Each structure stands twice: as C-alpha cells, then as structure tokens.
A protein has these predicted regions:
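Histidine-centered catalytic micro-motifs
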Residues: 73-82, 110-122, 226-233, 257-273, ...
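Transmembrane alpha-helical segments that form the membrane-embedded catalytic/substrate-channel core
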Residues: 67-77, 106-110, 154-158, 211-239, ...
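N-terminal pre-ligand scaffold of iron-sulfur
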Residues: 332-402, 416, 429-463
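Non-catalytic, topology-defining segments of multipass membrane proteins
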Residues: 1-67, 76, 101-209, 275-346, ...
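Transmembrane alpha-helical segments that serve as helix-helix packing and pore/cofactor-lining elements
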Residues: 25, 79-86
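Membrane-embedded alpha-helical segments that form the functional core of polytopic membrane enzymes
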Residues: 52-75, 98-108, 216-220, 249-260, ...
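Short cysteine/histidine-rich metal-coordination sites, predominantly Zn2+-binding motifs
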Residues: 402-408, 421-430
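Juxtamembrane helix-capping/reentrant segments at transmembrane boundaries
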Residues: 85-104, 126-139, 239-251
Length: 463
C-alpha cells in the first residue's frame, strides 16, 4: 500500500449546510413501508414456492424467493448498517441483524469491515471488500454469482468464530473489545443453521433448507448483479471516489430492490444521506461528477471491457473520466474563525447567540483550535471538539438530530451534551465545553470549567 492512502482525506463537492441538513434527515415511515413491502414479497414468493414444490413452476417461485432473500437483503443490510434507513436506532439494528443472517454475514465483524471500506475505498491492502482483486480471474467472478467460493468460506469462518478462533483478517479491523461479541453472534447463527439442518434430516426433506440457509447461495446472484456495478473495473489506490465508484441509472423496480444504491458514488461521498434522498443528492451535485452510466447494460459493457483487459494486464485502467475543475476539497459547514484574547479566562465570549440557527451546527475556529457549536433547540447550546474521535472528520459537516451529532464519514454518533459515544464506530468520548447564553452572547469555558454568568442574565444552560 502506498504511503498516505490509509484513513486519508477524500474529495467531496460543496453543498450548503442548510441543504445537507435536509438531505440527511431520516424517516421511519418511508423505511418501514419499503421494509414491509420487501418482507411481504418475500413471504408471498415463499408461500408460492411452498405450494408449488414438486411442480415445474417451483423453479421460478424459488428463484424469486431466493433473490429477495439472498439478494435484496443486501441493500437493506447496508443502509441499516449505516443507521440511515430508519430514524429509530432499534429498527435499523433489527433489520440489519436479520439481513446479516440472510447473507451469512456476522453482524459486528461486517459492520467494522464496512467502516474500513468507507475509510479506504478500493485501497489495496486496506479495503476488505474489494470484489475484483487484481489480477482478475473470470472463474472467481462466475463462481461468486452462486456463492460457490465466498459462501463456504464465510460459513467456515463463522464456525471458527463460534469456537472462539478469530482470524487475523478480522482482528485487523475489529476492535479487541468487540471480539467476544463476534464469537457470540457466530454461535447464534451457527446454532440456527444447525437447527435447520437437523430439521431437514429429521423429516427427510431438503425443504426447510430451501427456505433458510440455501437461499443465501441460490439467491445471491441478484446481489452480485447489482454490486459489480459499484466499483468493478475502476481505479485502485486513489483518493477520489469519482475515480473508483460509479452511479448507474436503473428502472424503478430495480431501484426498490437495490434501495437506490445505484447512486453509489453519491453514497460514498455523503454516507449520512439516507437512501430515499439519494436521487435528490444526485441532482444537487451531478455537475461535480462524471456522467452516470445510463443503464445496467452500459455499466456492464464498461465492466466487462475493463475486466477482460485487467485479466491480461492488471495495470490496465479505463480512461479517466472528464471531471469538473473545482477544488479538491470543500468546506461544507458554516464556519466562524476568530481569536479570543484569553482562552483560559473564566468565561470566553465566543460570539453572538444568534450566529447559529436552531437545529444547526457551526464550525468554530478559535485561536488555532476547532470546535463544533450546536444548537439542538432554541434554548439549548452545546460546544464540543470539532473532530470526530474515530475518523478525524469535522463534525460540523455532520447531521444534528436533537442532541445527537453524527459524523459524516462513518455515521458514528455522540451526545453533544456529554460527549458520550452513542453509535459505533466511535468509541472514544468527545470533549465537551460548558456554554451558556448571557444576554445576546455565548460564553464558554474552554478549559472545561463551568461558566458563572450573573443570575439575572442566565438562560437555560447546555448541560
């Protein structure tokens, strides 16, 4: 791996903070509707498959069931893993866990794997989710459409984890204190699968396995049908998602099955934007991006060309797309920069109380240090360190939902009042500072001590 590629800063186009707050808003209703519709189709196709067993139309019925089980589960797993599909955390976690089982993915291990994928997208030696490692091998890709290589490998790994043997690859990206969770999740998944196998043996029929377990294999073709378009044939070891990720226009049925992940470039640029807002995000930033592929056929034509060439010459690359000549990076947050006379004073005047609107975040740079100033409600202000403790990304570019701030890079969350980590991958608390409104000004303790404004001027404190 080249120096400077791990956990680096990536290109992102400029979008106004006001617009980003709208685009990053989540909805329980829309995600619930799409999830219920998916499960209804899964149940309906499963009932049809069960009723038609032994007849020729069982083949298309089971094909549909498998595609919804082992294929359409993937984007649900993905979006709920980011915590953006539903507004409610518990709903995201439930769907994520169920989809993980359907895909034979151990939840905690794969959550951390995907964090690494977003930190180091298609960086060789760092990204554990590179689908087409070079030199490209045709037989490997064809076998993956039926899970003939990856599936057995994932099951073997799951069994090893169930016995407490964690492989070095998993240890590379899963924190030590999460390894026991990996073991217990593997044990639960193995126990369920073993129970289904025992059920099939007991009744002398493969039917139970056709509904639980085997769909992860015979239905995975749909997963790969969509997934190869994300990064297939594009560049390795670059710090611009426009060079290693593609967007593809597809029809409404495919968009439902794939949960708008065809806007994959937009997703990598702004992973905090939920799937149902990706079309709007695309419209907002498309003038910064390469032209999208106009169909799955166009995408596959490019992918096949690239993979054929890379099979013979691993260094071969597709021609560089024409990119707009804008800045390599852009500040996305409202920003206030100023110097204060004595940052160690009992109370530091950091600015006017009305410099930040309710529900917004402002980047505040004072004397060479950077902070995130938040206003969850009209009477509540909070001041934290500006950089996320996990990815060193500025939190002012993130999403404020009540008293929770979300990192724009990995979707980790903190309570802005206490700095407490609320969602992984963040594990280290965020430094917070006492702040109160005194008249029309904001007074802060930048040394961590409490502000003592005159009682007559005191309003609701931030903590």
């Amino acid at each position: 791996m080249q120096d400077g590629l791990a956990d680096a800063q990536w290109y992102r186009p400029a979008v106004s903070p006001e617009r980003m707050q709208v685009l990053m808003a989540r909805s329980n209703g829309r995600a619930a509707f799409h999830t219920v519709l998916w499960l209804a189709l899964l149940a309906g196709s499963g009932a049809l498959a069960f009723q038609s067993r032994g007849r020729w139309w069982a083949i298309p019925a089971f094909a549909a069931y498998g595609a919804l089980y082992g294929g359409a589960a993937d984007p649900r797993w993905h979006e709920c893993g980011h915590g953006t599909a539903f507004k409610s955390r518990w709903a995201n976690d439930v769907v994520y866990t169920v989809a993980s089982f359907m895909l034979l993915r151990e939840p905690t291990m794969w959550r951390w794997s995907h964090v690494r994928h977003h930190s180091d997208t298609i960086i060789v030696g760092r990204d554990p989710e590179i689908s087409f490692p070079r030199p490209f091998k045709v037989r490997v890709v064809l076998a993956n459409y039926l899970h003939l290589l990856n599936g057995p490998a994932m099951l073997r790994r799951m069994v090893r984890h169930a016995f407490g043997s964690i492989d070095d690859d998993a240890r590379d990206f899963v924190p030590e204190d999460d390894l026991p969770r990996v073991v217990w999740e593997a044990r639960i998944f193995v126990a369920v699968l073993a129970g289904v196998i025992a059920w099939s043996v007991l009744i002398g029929s493969i039917v139970p396995l056709l509904f639980i377990g085997l769909p992860s294999f015979y239905g995975v073709w749909l997963l790969w049908f969509f997934a190869v378009t994300q990064h297939g044939g594009l560049r390795e070891d670059v710090l611009d998602h426009r060079l290693n990720t593609r967007t593809v226009y597809i029809n409404p049925v495919f968009r439902f099955l794939y949960l708008n992940m065809n806007y994959h470039l937009e997703h990598h640029l702004f992973p905090s934007v939920p799937y149902h807002h990706l079309p709007q995000l695309h419209a907002e930033i498309k003038h910064h991006l390469p032209p999208p592929k106009t169909s799955m056929f166009a995408a596959y034509r490019e992918i096949v060309l690239a993979l054929r060439r890379q099979h013979k010459d691993p260094t071969w690359e597709l021609p560089l797309p024409v990119l707009p000549a804008d800045a390599p990076a852009a500040v996305l947050s409202s920003k206030v920069t100023r110097d204060v006379e004595d940052p160690e004073a009992d109370a530091v005047d950091i600015g006017a109380a009305d410099m930040i609107e309710t529900g917004r975040i402002v980047r505040l740079d004072l004397n060479g240090r950077t902070y995130a100033l938040c206003r969850p409600t009209a009477d509540l202000y909070a001041l934290t360190d500006g950089l996320c403790t996990h990815g060193q990304t500025h939190l002012a570019e993130g999403f404020l939902d009540g008293c929770t701030i979300e990192c724009p890079k990995h979707n980790g969350r903190f309570d802005v009042r206490t700095g407490e980590p609320l969602r992984k991958p963040v594990r280290i608390p965020l430094a917070t500072y006492e702040i109160e409104r005194v008249g029309g000004r904001l007074m802060a303790r930048l040394d961590g001590r409490r502000v003592p404004p005159p009682p007559a001027l005191r309003t609701t404190p931030s903590r």
